[in-house]
Swiss-Prot record:
It is found in: Cell membrane. It comes from Clavibacter sepedonicus. Keywords: Cell membrane, Flavoprotein, FMN, Membrane, Oxidoreductase, Pyrimidine biosynthesis. Binds 1 FMN per subunit. This is Dihydroorotate dehydrogenase (quinone). HAMAP family: DHO_dh_type2.
C-alpha cells in the first residue's frame, strides 16, 4: 500500500512538506491510541537487544539524526519499532536553516540531497521536551546530535558546542558530535585533528559522564578516518558514528541535469552504502573492541543491517530509506533480523 501512496501522492509533494506530514502523523500515534496497536505489531524480538553505552537497546536498528530534529515524534518512532532515535541536529540557538527548497529526491537512486542547514528550535526547547520524555517508561533510547550554530565563527565553536552540551546532556542517553555536515560553512574543517582535539575534550568534560560519540564524513581519506578513531580512543570517547552525507555525485542513475538542478548539499541513501561500509571496517580495525560504532548510510533491508553488524557495527541507523519504505520499515528490518538469526 505504501509504495502506491508514495508513487501517486507523496512523490508529487514537495519533499519537505511530505516529511513534515509524515513526522506529524508519527507524532500523533501515542495520543491517538494507535501507537499501542503499532507497538504490538512492531516490537523487536527480545533476541535483538544490544547492550552498549551502558544502555539496553531493544533493537540494533534506529533512526539517524535529521528525521526528528526537535524530538516531536520520538515516542511514535519507538512504537514503530526503532530501537533508538537520534534527535537533532540541535544548536545552542534556534535557527531557520537554509532557504527552501532544500530537500530533493533522487528516486532512481533511492537517495536524497539535502542542504537543510541545521534548522531547529534550539537546545533549551529540545531539553525541555526531552525532560518530559524521560519520564516515559515506553520511550526508546534517545541520542542527541549537536552541531555548531551557523552565526558562530569556527574559532568560537568550542564554547558554542559546550553551551549546547550543558543544556542537553542531562536529558540525553548519549551525545553525537556533528562535525561532518556539509551544509554549515566551515563545519567539516573541525574534523582536522588540531581543531577536533580541544572540541571533543571540552564536550566530553561538559557531558559529565554521558557517552559521547563523534559523527564523521564519508569524504575523509582513509588515513584521516584512522586518525580520528585514534583520537576518539585517546580521549576516552564512547565511539564513532559513520557516516554523514557525502558531497560526491559519482555513479548516480538519476539524470545529470536533475542532479545539477538540485544543487549543493549532502547526498544520502543507497549510493552511500559502499563507502559507509569501507569506513566502518576501518573504524572496527582501529578502535578498541568495546568501542561503540554506529553505522549509517545506504541501509535499506535487514540484510544490509546484518552486513553492517557482521562488519563490526554495534548499532545501525537509517533515514533516507524510511522515506521510500514507509512506516513499517523498522518492523520489516527487525523481523528480517530475527529470521536471519533464527537457528536452521
Amino acid at each position: 500500500m505504501y509504495p502506491l501512496l508514495f508513487r501517486t501522492v507523496l512523490s508529487r509533494m514537495d519533499p519537505e512538506d511530505a516529511h513534515h506530514l509524515a513526522s506529524t502523523a508519527i507524532s500523533l500515534l501515542p495520543p491517538s491510541g494507535l501507537g499501542w496497536i503499532a507497538r504490538r505489531l512492531t516490537a523487536p524480538d527480545p533476541s535483538l537487544a544490544v547492550d552498549t553505552l551502558g544502555l539496553r537497546f531493544p533493537s540494533p536498528f534506529g533512526v539517524a539524526a535529521g528525521f526528528d530534529k526537535d524530538a516531536r515524534a520520538v515516542l511514535g518512532l519507538g512504537q514503530l519499532g526503532f530501537g533508538h532515535v537520534e534527535v537533532g541536529t540541535v544548536t545552542a540557538e534556534a535557527q531557520p536553516g537554509n532557504p527552501r527548497p532544500r530537500l530533493f529526491r533522487l528516486i532512481e537512486d533511492r537517495a536524497v540531497i539535502n542542504r537543510m542547514g541545521f534548522n531547529n528550535g534550539g537546545a533549551a526547547a529540545l531539553a525541555d521536551r526531552l525532560r518530559r520524555l524521560r519520564t516515559r517508561r515506553d520511550r526508546p533510547v534517545i541520542g542527541v546530535n549537536i552541531g555548531k550554530t551557523r552565526v558562530v565563527a569556527v574559532e568560537d565553536a568550542v564554547a558554542d558546542y559546550v553551551r549546547t552540551t550543558r543544556l542537553v546532556a542531562p536529558v540525553a542517553d548519549y551525545l553525537a558530535v556533528n562535525v561532518s555536515s556539509p551544509n554549515t560553512p566551515g563545519l567539516r574543517g573541525l574534523q582536522e585533528i588540531d581543531l577536533l582535539r580541544p572540541l571533543l575534550t571540552s564536550i566530553r568534560d561538559a557531558a559529565d559522564g554521558v557517552p559521547v560519540l563523534v559523527k564523521i564524513a564519508p569524504d575523509l581519506q582513509d588515513a584521516e578516518v584512522e586518525r580520528i578513531a585514534e583520537l576518539a580512543t585517546e580521549l576516552g570517547l564512547a565511539g564513532v558514528i559513520a557516516t554523514n552525507t557525502t558531497l560526491s555525485r559519482a555513479d548516480l542513475r538519476t539524470d545529470a541535469a536533475v542532479v545539477e538542478a538540485a544543487g549543493a548539499g549532502g547526498l544520502s541513501g543507497a549510493p552511500l552504502a559502499p563507502r559507509a561500509l569501507e569506513v566502518l571496517r576501518i573504524l572496527r580495525r582501529v578502535l578498541p573492541s568495546d568501542a561503540c560504532i554506529i553505522s549509517v548510510g545506504g541501509v535499506d533491508t535487514a540484510d544490509d543491517v546484518q552486513s553492517r553488524l557482521d562488519a563490526g557495527a554495534t548499532l545501525v541507523q537509517g533515514y533516507t530509506a524510511f522515506l521510500y519504505r514507509g512506516p513499517l520499515w523498522a518492523r520489516s528490518i527487525n523481523a528480517g533480523l530475527a529470521r536471519i538469526r533464527r537457528p536452521r
